[in-house]
Amino acid sequence: MERILENAMYASRWLLAPIYFGLSLGLLALALKFFQEVIHVLPNVFALSEADLILVILSLIDMSLVGGLLVMVMISGYENFVSQLDIDDSKEKLNWLGKMDSSSLKMKVAASIVAISSIHLLRVFMDAQNISTDYLMWYVIIHMTFVVSAFCMGYLDKVTKH
């Protein structure tokens, strides 16, 4: 009975595979939205103010960071919790494949969240004259919460590894 239960629990990790595949569909949706934004802005690039162009570029950078986060979570999560990727040696291989454990994945996710939050905060500050002080204050508080959380996670990770 114990063996059957253990084998069933171990096999249940494959339930994560469609979830990680779903993230790839999310990445596809993000790529479509990225190029929709590029196609939308290119014909109007000369009519945009410098501030508006910077906001569009920040939005594109934000999408690229989210895309990188999706790839990292999708591939590392699959490798850590489901199965190793069998990538042919003749194909291009990411140098971090097989090297990122769940702890380093958490740190990279935390750093990505801080970077994404920073871009959002910069976008808010670029339009600060149209935004209430309370909204700005809460945005900074939330961002600092992400920063402090990432710092604490890194510190705890360093302390537990030594």
UniProtKB/Swiss-Prot annotation:
Entries under PANTHER family matching the protein: UPF0114 PROTEIN YQHA
Superkingdom classification of source: Bacteria
Keyword Membrane carried by entry: yes
Membrane protein topology class: Multi-pass membrane protein
Protein's recorded name: UPF0114 protein PputW619_4503
InterPro entries: UPF0114, UPF0114_bac
High-level lineage: Bacteria, Pseudomonadati, Pseudomonadota, Gammaproteobacteria, Pseudomonadales
Assigned GO CC terms: plasma membrane
